[in-house]
Amino acid sequence: MASRSAGTLLTEFNAAYVPPGLMPGYQGHVPTVAFSFGAPYGTTTLKYFQDHRNRAMEKSHTPFSQGGHFPTIFSTNPNLLLMERASTRDRWLHKPSYTRFNLDSHRSTELTNFYQMVQQHRKYYQDKTGTVPRVPYFAMPVREPERYPLPTVLPPLCPKKKWHLLRLAPENLKTYQTFPSGKRVSPQERKKRDCYFEFRA
């Protein structure tokens, strides 16, 4: 049987004959899209999707539309930011209840924790009373000797403490013994006497 796709169809009209190498294959069918000979199925459906998406995005920018006003944390519109909303119990009404499942859970947890720390830090530097604690994640680093001081490096002493230390120093202690007669005996002489009189019966 003669077939056009196999190239065995014989016709006497040259305009009706299409070579098999130039004959397009199955291009699919989109009911709502007008079919054009030069556009394949993938290009036609992609253009249909992009047109539909662009129309929806343009409509969502108007304040009278039903969609497009979803609360978010990153937006060029300050009215959509979660931080700009009222800090009352109504903020839980605007909290997004949807999640995306195509994300890395570990990275999403890190970003969520970082965002919470950012909000706490923002409350800290906006606080005028000094009652909000500082977030240690955003503390500026200090030099190592200041953060880990050596135990031998002591702060400067006040004159009162210095006087007490000098008074209790070994070289300032009384190391001699005073007898009732007024004679003073050095510890070396006492040691010799103890060695001698230790064995005395």
Curated annotation (Swiss-Prot):
UniProt-listed GO biological process terms: flagellated sperm motility
Main localization of the protein described in the UniProt heading: cytoplasm
Pfam families in UniProt: CMI2B-like
InterPro entries per the UniProt record, alphabetical: CIMIP2C, CMI2A-C-like_dom
Location in the cell: Cytoplasm, Cytoskeleton, Cilium axoneme; Cytoplasm, Cytoskeleton, Flagellum axoneme
Record-level GO cellular component terms: axonemal A tubule inner sheath; axonemal microtubule; nucleus; sperm flagellum
Keyword Transmembrane belongs to the record: no
Record-stated family: Belongs to the CIMIP2 family.
Protein name per UniProt: Ciliary microtubule inner protein 2C
Lineage: Eukaryota, Metazoa, Chordata, Craniata, Vertebrata
Name of the gene this protein is made from: CIMIP2C
